[in-house]
Amino acid sequence: MAIGLIGRKVGMTRIFTEDGVSIPVTVIEVAGNRVTQVKTLETDGYRALQVTTGTKKANRITKPEAGHFAKSGVEAGRGLWEVRLEDGEGEGIEVGAELNVDIFADVAKVDVTGQSKGKGFQGGVKRWNFRTQDMTHGNSLSHRSNGSIGQNQTPGRVFKGKKMSGHMGAERVTTQNLVVVRVDVERNLLLVRGAVPGATNGDLIIKPAVKA
């Protein structure tokens, strides 16, 4: 069985192979994911697991959250996440069960979803990798400006979705096909090759790679 789990980005480091090759890895802490609800085709129209992880102070829990956790008999966590299930997945998992990183023991590659680091308002050069204009040759004001953003009277407007300056980052990003380098069951750690979205301590959704 290989369904998605919720983890926390610990940071990056490197490990060495027996041949002395350095591999950059991201360390993800995948503490116990407690099942708070099992959604079925009959009651919800689709199959999914709702899970929580971590802890949350009692004075930070809203009454609806408290009722939901009490109904499931699960300790309140720092949030609620939902993981879709395909046919045949998650059979036998009940409310209150705890899922751990060992379910990735036989998984070669994973997709990791997180919220990218926010960069604030940025121009086209940084946000979209536009090339800069001439530094000299009569250009004194438009070194990093976008340049032309459209045509003339026809169509007489700027098309929607045009790449321009604006808010960069702080959006949901998925990095696909990250190689699983190591699964540390004792310390609840998952080591994947390369970088994952988001800052240190950010929440991540780890799923088996769909394109592996």
From Swiss-Prot:
Pfam families the UniProt entry points to: Ribosomal_L3
Stored InterPro entries: Ribosomal_uL3, Ribosomal_uL3_bac/org-type, Ribosomal_uL3_CS, Transl_B-barrel_sf
Gene Ontology CC terms, in alphabetical order: cytosolic large ribosomal subunit
Post-translational modification N5-methylglutamine, affected residues: Q153
Transmembrane segments: none
Annotated spans, Disordered: 136-157
Keywords, comma-separated and alphabetical: Methylation, Ribonucleoprotein, Ribosomal protein, RNA-binding, rRNA-binding
One MF annotation (Gene Ontology) recorded for this entry: structural constituent of ribosome
GO biological process: one example: translation
PROSITE patterns reported in the protein's UniProt record: RIBOSOMAL_L3
This protein's record includes keyword RNA-binding: yes
Entry superkingdom: Bacteria
Keyword Transferase part of the UniProt annotation: no
Polar residues bias: start-end ranges: 136-155
Post-translational modification: Methylated by PrmB.
Oligomer and partners: Part of the 50S ribosomal subunit. Forms a cluster with proteins L14 and L19.
PANTHER family: 50S RIBOSOMAL PROTEIN L3, LARGE RIBOSOMAL SUBUNIT PROTEIN UL3C
HAMAP family per the UniProt record, alphabetical: Ribosomal_uL3_B
Family of the protein in this entry: Belongs to the universal ribosomal protein uL3 family.
Function: One of the primary rRNA binding proteins, it binds directly near the 3'-end of the 23S rRNA, where it nucleates assembly of the 50S subunit.
Name by which UniProt lists this protein: Large ribosomal subunit protein uL3
Organism of this sequence: Shewanella sp. (strain W3-18-1)
